């Protein structure tokens, strides 16, 4: 089962990814994790990436693809894998295709921008414990304070509306075109193309997961 999840920030990809890797016993392949592991091991690709990152540059798609190919040789990928945060751009998607790294399913979890903003901007954190609340979906007993300690809750900078809107702009300009790319490829009838599905990201975690499993196992 070789999977990729697409969707905006706050669409629920991380939650569903955790459930999917547990159900299908496949690893979650994260470019960030791969970079850190390659640098720690001192592999040639890792050392190349480290030099670029230390100089403040962006790691090239060639290096990222090389790391992906290296990672997929590990025995834990024999049953498949789930891509997390990769590819992010059309250039990376084309590079993945050229490298003949095949996918079975690409699933877009679709959520309206305004709902994403409400989901993320409503989060409140109790920093010392890491407890998370939501002003609408999981409010504290008393507004603005932690249930257990009575200490104040904060809103992280990443959860502020202005920051979320900027992240959504980046998503729509860079990553959302992947939806069209994989949709058109699937519709082309190519044997190499993964199946493409769009599901609603609105509903309970369990409902969304059941919808994904139905797609994958039908």
Swiss-Prot record:
Determine if Transferase is one of this entry's keywords: yes
Give the matching InterPro entries. Answer: Adenyl_kin_sub, Adenylat/UMP-CMP_kin, Adenylat_kinase_CS, Adenylate_kinase_lid-dom, P-loop_NTPase
- Write out the transmembrane intervals: none
Can you supply a Gene Ontology BP term from the record? AMP salvage
User: Catalytic activity, per the record?
Assistant: AMP + ATP = 2 ADP
The enzyme's first-digit EC class, named in words, is transferase
So what family is this one in?
Belongs to the adenylate kinase family.
Subunit (UniProt): Monomer.
Task: Supply the name of the protein.
Answer: Adenylate kinase
Organism whose genome encodes this protein? Legionella pneumophila (strain Corby)
Its gene?
Answer: adk
């Amino acid at each position: 089962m070789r999977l990729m999840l697409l969707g905006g920030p706050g669409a629920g990809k991380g939650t569903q990814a955790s459930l999917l890797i547990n159900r299908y016993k496949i690893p979650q392949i994260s470019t960030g994790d791969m970079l850190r592991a390659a640098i720690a091991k001192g592999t040639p690709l890792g050392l190349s990436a480290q030099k670029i990152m230390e100089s403040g540059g962006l790691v090239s798609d060639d290096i990222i693809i090389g790391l992906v190919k290296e990672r997929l040789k590990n025995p834990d990928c024999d049953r498949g894998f789930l891509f997390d945060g990769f590819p992010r751009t059309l250039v990376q998607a084309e590079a993945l295709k050229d490298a003949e790294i095949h996918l079975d399913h690409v699933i877009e979890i679709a959520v309206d921008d305004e709902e994403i903003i409400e989901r993320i901007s409503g989060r409140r954190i109790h920093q010392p414990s890491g407890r998370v609340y939501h002003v609408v979906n999981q409010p504290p007993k008393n507004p603005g304070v932690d249930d257990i300690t009575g200490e104040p809750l904060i809103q992280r900078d990443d959860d502020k509306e202005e920051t979320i809107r900027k992240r959504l702009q980046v998503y729509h300009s860079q990553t959302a075109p992947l939806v069209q790319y994989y949709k058109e490829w699937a519709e082309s009838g190519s044997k190499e193309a993964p199946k493409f599905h769009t599901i609603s990201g609105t509903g309970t975690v369990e409902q969304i997961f059941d919808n994904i499993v139905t797609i994958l196992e039908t």
